[in-house]
Structures are given as structure tokens and as C-alpha cells.
Amino acid sequence: MMNQSITPPTHPPMSQRFRGYLPVVVDVETGGFNWNHHALLEIACIPIEMDDTGRLYPGEVTSTHVIPAPGTDIDPKSLEVTGIILDHPFRFAKEEKLALEHIFTPVRATMKKYKCQRAILVGHNAHFDLNFLNAAVTRTAYKRNPFHQFSVFDTVTLAGMAYGQTVLARAVQAAGLDWNAADAHSAVYDAEKTAHLFCTITNTWPLVVAG
């Protein structure tokens, strides 16, 4: 039998694409704007995956509603925006520490799959999501946070560079993607749209490797 040579991939693996970081889209819905005082109410995350050609695509979404942590506040106006009904019988909210474990478990599994060292949060106004995530980690004394504590990929910046748009709805549409305003302000929907936006931009502008 003739030996058949295997052509190596021409793209870097995920473990090298972002310096060992796995991009993970996170979107949170909250009881206000102050992460030190307002409650985390809903969180969704989507690890970014890579196909055999090096193109990025959104992985599976994981989400949960969150029981407001003791001592945190909720601005009623925030509930008007998100449409969250705290006592809805089908909300099935988890306590904050269990919610974090629920979200972080698939992140760690995807990191292992791609041999990445840490996760890096991708978000639209990403530091808002990261600050609420870090506040929850601190409140619960969670010890296995896979995310970098301060570095992010912000799709506001990326979309501004790529399309001249910074509002999520407008950026998504400028990228040629669908947007339904009625579904916005759900952590799952916003995370899905942010993930597709990030992948569209990243796949459109190929990696330039310094020679």
C-alpha cells in the first residue's frame, strides 16, 4: 500500500489562534447597572468552536436564570426592559453558585477539547458582562472560574471597526444577519447574535501571521 501524505492544516489550531484563550460569548441580564449592588438574573454562554478549515462558529448555548443573591438589589425599570418575571413558575432559577457551575462546566470541557489554557469573554459591551460575572464569582467564593479576570473581546469595538456600527441590533444587521427586536434582551438571544457577529467578523478578516 502506498503511503499517503497528510497535508497539514494551513490555519493555526484554536489553542494558538488567540494565544491559548478560548473565546466564549457571555450575556447577562441583571437588576441594574451596578455590578456591586444589583442582582445577576440570567446568564448565557456560547463557546466559540473551529471547523476543519479554521473558520469559527458558535458552539452550543448554555443558560440559566439566577436567583437574586442575598443583599443585591433590583431596579424595577430593569425588569421592564428584560421582561423577566421573578416569580414566574417556569423560571427554574438556580442559586448563584450553582448557576456559575452550570455555565462554567461546558466552558471547561470546550477548553479541554481545544487544549486552551483559559477562556476569554466575548461580549457586546463586554466589561459589563465580565464585571457582573466577576462579582458573582466573588460573592460565591467560586474557585474554578475559567475566564480571564480582565481581558475581553468586545464586539462593540469589532463592529465599529468592521461596519461602523456599535449598537448590537444595527451591527448584526450590517453583518447581514437577522435581528428580531421582540426577542432582544434575552440572555440567550443576545448571546447567540453576539456569537454570530463575532464569528462573522473574525472569519471575514483573516489572521495575519507575522513573518
UniProtKB/Swiss-Prot annotation:
Coiled coil ranges: none
Record's keyword terms, sorted: Exonuclease, Hydrolase, Magnesium, Metal-binding, Nuclease, tRNA processing
Lineage: superkingdom: Bacteria
Cofactor, free-text remark: Binds two Mg(2+) per subunit. The active form of the enzyme binds two Mg(2+) ions in its active site. The first Mg(2+) forms only one salt bridge with the protein.
GO molecular function, one term: nucleic acid binding
Subunit and interaction comment: Homodimer.
Protein name: Ribonuclease T
Organism: Xylella fastidiosa (strain 9a5c)
